[in-house]
Amino acid sequence: MTEAATSLKRTLVGRVVSNKMDKTVTVLIENRVKHPLYGKYVVRSKKYHAHDEANQYNEGDKVEITESRPLSRTKSWVVSRLLEAARVI
C-alpha cells in the first residue's frame, strides 16, 4: 500500500463515552462551527461506533479513530491509537 492510499482515510479525534459493547467503543466527536447569521460559535457533536479489538480503551480516553470498511451495520471506524488516558479519580 502506498502513502497516497493511506492518507485518503479520514481520521477524527474524540473521547470514548461508552465501552460496554464487546470489541466496540462509542466515540464522541465535537466540532466548533460558526453560526452563519449570528457569528456565535456552536459546538456540534456526533457519536461514532469504533472497533476496539482488545477491549483496551476506557470511558474518558482521548482516542484517534480511522475510517475503514464496514465492520457491522453501525461500525465503520477503527480506533487507531490512544492520545490521552482518562484520569482516575
Curated annotation (Swiss-Prot):
Organism domain of life: Bacteria
Task: Cite the InterPro entries for this sequence.
Answer: NA-bd_OB-fold, Ribosomal_uS17, Ribosomal_uS17_bact/chlr, Ribosomal_uS17_CS
Might you report a single GO cellular component term?
A: cytosolic small ribosomal subunit
Q: Which PROSITE patterns match?
A: RIBOSOMAL_S17 (PS00056)
Q: Which CDD domains match?
A: Ribosomal_uS17
Instruction: Using the record for this protein, list the coiled-coil segments as residue ranges, or answer none.
Output: none
GO MF term set:
rRNA binding; structural constituent of ribosome
Q: Which family does it belong to?
A: Belongs to the universal ribosomal protein uS17 family.
Subunit relationships: Part of the 30S ribosomal subunit.
What NCBIfam families does UniProt report for this protein, alphabetically? PRK05610.1 (NF004123), uS17_bact (TIGR03635)
Q: Which HAMAP family match?
A: Ribosomal_uS17_B
The protein's name is Small ribosomal subunit protein uS17
Task: Give the species this sequence originates from.
Answer: Ralstonia pickettii (strain 12J)
Q: What is the lineage of its organism?
A: Bacteria, Pseudomonadati, Pseudomonadota, Betaproteobacteria, Burkholderiales
